[in-house]
Amino acid sequence: PIDQLERAKGSNRAEIFYAIVPDPKAAYSCAHSEADAVRQVQGTFLHEMQHLISFNEHVLARGGAAEDTWLNEGLSHVAEELGSRYFESRYPAPFGRSTPTQLYPDSAGPFIGPLLLNAYLYLNSSLQHSVTAYDGTGSIEERGATWLFLRWLADQKGDDITRRLVQTSRTGIANVEAASGERFSSLFGDFSLALFADSLPGVARNAIPPRLRFGNRSLRLIMAREAVVSGFFDPFPLATFAAPPGDILRSSMPPGTMIHAIIPGDPSAGPVRLSFSTSELTPFASLLGAQMSIMRLPP
């Protein structure tokens, strides 16, 4: 981004996108065939172009601060998905696929493949990785978390919300709230439920409120396919815990994480009381923003 600031010392007053080039004989770096370079650069170009656009809109055009890392990276991964969506529309099933079981055409692979892997790894460790608080520039699990959140958000509010998130001087959670017209706590709570409720086994998909599922992508279906492609054993790795009445569930939860628990019981048996506390058995401080979302499962 410094190249975009003409007043910066040492600036060449140009916008440059740096990428790898084919080097099959490893003359200047590790070996990169032409096919490898093309495959890797496609999604990376869309990803980095979003960063350039975001910096221009936030800093240069509006004089604000650069977008928060978690949201900036999440939007760049959404930009990668645009490449997949282009080829998905160009090659509807079963066209453009090496095998009839493929969910996506071959040409979409370089764009959607890494996103699905990131998402799977996040779901496999959702208690350890935050949606909104990155460790540095973000692990692949954290990036998977933010992509899933923004994908769900766009399904709820329309794809144009990504434009509103970029064309503004707002950043972070305040940006999400302004663009969506909702409190972040409400969005995060329903997103947490959607991760579990989307395409719930044994329940018709349209029996789940649209707010508690993704749009036309079945999360469990695409994660099950990702498990096959990447050699994982669990078709849907999101952990759920049993919390029968009278039981205690303990867990460490960094900011921006969630835990999913199923409370079995007979509705005719009367109400169930839930109590939450810190590890010291004291109430949560209000600044922590601890919250609970409840979904009654169909019988």
Located regions from the model:
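Juxtacatalytic substrate-recognition/specificity segment
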Residues: P1-D68, L75, A79, G83-S98
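Beta/coil-rich, acidic/histidine-enriched accessory regions frequently appended to metallopeptidases
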Residues: T171-P299
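Generic preference for hydrophobic/aromatic residues in regular secondary structure cores
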Residues: D3-Q4, G10-I20, K25-Y28, L117-L123, ...
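Stable alpha-helical elements in mature extracytoplasmic
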Residues: A37, V41, F45-M49, L71-L75, ...
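Acidic/His/Gly-enriched intrinsically disordered linker/tail segments
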Residues: G64-T146, I173-D198
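Structured segments of extracytoplasmic/periplasmic soluble domains
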Residues: L52-N56, A79-Y86, W152-D160, R164, ...
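Generic structural hydrophobic/aromatic packing signal, biased to beta-strands
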Residues: A19, H47, S76, L150, ...
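Hydrophobic transmembrane alpha-helix bundles
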Residues: I2-P24, R97-Y104, R164, L195-I222
